[in-house]
């Protein structure tokens, strides 16, 4: 099962994965019928934060701050009395990234006083060091805000979730609990006793960083849209996660839908009741001309893990202009742009959703565009964020699908415009070309 494998296991045949798992037989994009049974087993509100484990939180956080336009909002480190780990919170709109690195265990080896305890109660020196050694820079926790973290944990475990950290109440205000998601990644539940606490602070033990001491960066990124995992076998992972959360299947793609002549994947998306918490999961396809990019990830990551984070922008053109300015000076690089023919055919594919000037800007910035029967998706992918060809970031903007809630307030439905099914082949080609450059250099070496 994906969440249990520390090492990479080869599928004998890609049909052995999701197709053989009870309740999850992939039928492909064209035959899949989207339904929302509103089957969550506990009340889910939204994504709360993403925690990265790293070797040095200060420098990694600074790079993400500069590259994504996220401001330093809170800290828990030696200066706040935390002798266990350094943690720095970056925010942009509702998006929260937390970067955590261990201090020497000897600092807190004796009697730990309240002023020296870890702000993240589940933090463990050995686990963090082992994680970083095995995976390099990566996501440790996908945190979702729930109505009651203790209840969510109990229900999850009762429905097959593997416990990672039992519920802990912080300052009689916030409850945190964790279960295993896949690989060494955990699904973290966060709940607040009172709404005013939720709005006033991130977590107890963190001190706010005043605006005056944080350079006011903002490139237009507003929230986390979806968090994607890679596993050796899709079926068991889907059965496991859907089994303890109750999340329903929102979309699916098979190698026939999204592969190239050289490689492919199978993928399915799990969603919460309001479809604002989206968890796609991928598996590699074997027996193709080239090794699947998912298999490459699994080998370099030493097992299952989080592949990429899709960040929602309110203006993708502004976001990309700002990010590309910084690509060569400490920011993030992007995958190669598609050929000119892609943009010549774009008007035919997306209709009047984008003006001619906007299509021209998409070409200049390398933005991919796709649409489904409900809305339009604009997207672009970075190259891997660190030394290994593993985790990367997707910047997206969704257009359309506007709804009204019971109070008449407008909102955009989750997953509007789909997941770029029409762009998968372009993305695969660019990743294949990127991997070929690495292989060529390895052969020369």
From Swiss-Prot:
InterPro entries: 4OHPhenylPyrv_dOase (IPR005956), 4OHPhenylPyrv_dOase_C (IPR041735), 4OHPhenylPyrv_dOase_N (IPR041736), Glyas_Bleomycin-R_OHBP_Dase (IPR029068), Glyas_Fos-R_dOase_dom (IPR004360), VOC (IPR037523). It catalyses: 3-(4-hydroxyphenyl)pyruvate + O2 = homogentisate + CO2. One of its GO terms (biological process) is tyrosine catabolic process. Residues 1-11 have a biased composition (Polar residues). Residues 1-20 are annotated as: Disordered. CDD domains: HPPD_C_like, HPPD_N_like. Keywords: Cytoplasm, Dioxygenase, Iron, Metal-binding, Oxidoreductase, Phenylalanine catabolism, Repeat, Tyrosine catabolism. It is an enzyme of class 1 (oxidoreductase). Residues 46-192, 223-383 form the VOC domain. One of its GO terms (cellular component) is cytoplasm. Fe cation binds at residues 226, 308, 394. Binds 1 Fe cation per subunit. Pathway: Amino-acid degradation; L-phenylalanine degradation; acetoacetate and fumarate from L-phenylalanine: step 3/6; Cofactor biosynthesis; prenylquinone biosynthesis. It is found in: Cytoplasm. The keyword Iron applies. Homodimer. Catalyzes the conversion of 4-hydroxyphenylpyruvic acid to homogentisic acid, one of the steps in tyrosine catabolism. Belongs to the 4HPPD family. NCBIfam families: 4HPPD. This is 4-hydroxyphenylpyruvate dioxygenase.
């Amino acid at each position: 099962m994906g969440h249990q494998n520390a090492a990479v296991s080869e599928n004998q045949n890609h049909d052995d994965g999701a197709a053989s798992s009870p309740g999850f037989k992939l039928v492909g994009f064209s035959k899949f019928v989207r339904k929302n049974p509103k089957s969550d087993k506990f009340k889910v509100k939204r994504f709360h934060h993403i925690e990265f484990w790293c070797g040095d939180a200060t420098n990694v956080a600074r790079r993400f701050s500069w590259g994504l336009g996220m401001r330093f909002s809170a800290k828990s480190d030696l200066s706040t009395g935390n002798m266990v780990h350094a943690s720095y919170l970056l925010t942009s709109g509702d998006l929260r990234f937390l970067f955590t690195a261990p201090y020497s265990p000897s600092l807190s080896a004796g009697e730990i006083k309240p002023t020296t305890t870890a702000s993240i109660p589940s933090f463990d020196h050995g686990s963090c060091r082992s994680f970083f050694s095995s995976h390099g820079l990566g996501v440790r926790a996908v945190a979702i805000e729930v109505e009651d973290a203790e209840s969510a944990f109990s229900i999850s475990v009762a429905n097959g979730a593997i416990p990672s950290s039992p519920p802990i109440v912080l300052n009689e205000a916030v409850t945190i609990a964790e279960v295993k998601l896949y690989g060494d990644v955990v699904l973290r539940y966060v709940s607040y006793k009172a709404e005013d606490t939720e709005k006033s602070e991130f977590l107890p033990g963190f001190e706010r960083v005043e605006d005056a001491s944080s350079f006011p960066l903002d490139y237009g990124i507003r929230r986390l849209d979806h968090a994607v995992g890679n596993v050796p076998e899709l079926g068991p992972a889907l059965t496991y996660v859907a089994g303890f959360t109750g999340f329903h299947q929102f979309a699916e793609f098979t190698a026939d839908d999204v592969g190239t002549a050289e490689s492919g994947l199978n993928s399915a998306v799990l969603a919460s009741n309001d479809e604002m918490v989206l968890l796609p999961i991928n598996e590699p396809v074997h027996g193709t001309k080239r090794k699947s990019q998912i298999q490459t990830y699994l080998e370099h990551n030493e097992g299952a893990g989080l592949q990429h984070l899709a960040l929602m922008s309110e203006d993708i053109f502004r976001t990309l202009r700002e990010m590309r300015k910084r690509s060569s000076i400490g920011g993030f690089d992007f995958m190669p742009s598609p050929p000119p023919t892609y943009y010549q055919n774009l008007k035919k594919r997306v209709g009047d959703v984008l003006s001619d000037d906007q299509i021209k800007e998409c070409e200049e910035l390398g933005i991919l565009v796709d649409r489904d029967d409900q809305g339009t998706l604009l997207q672009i992918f970075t190259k891997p964020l660190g030394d290994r060809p593993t985790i990367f970031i997707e910047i997206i903007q969704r257009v359309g699908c506007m709804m009204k809630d019971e109070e008449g307030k407008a909102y955009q439905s989750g997953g509007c415009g789909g997941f770029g099914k029409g762009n998968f082949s372009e993305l695969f080609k660019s990743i294949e070309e990127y991997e070929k450059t690495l292989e060529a250099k390895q052969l020369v070496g």
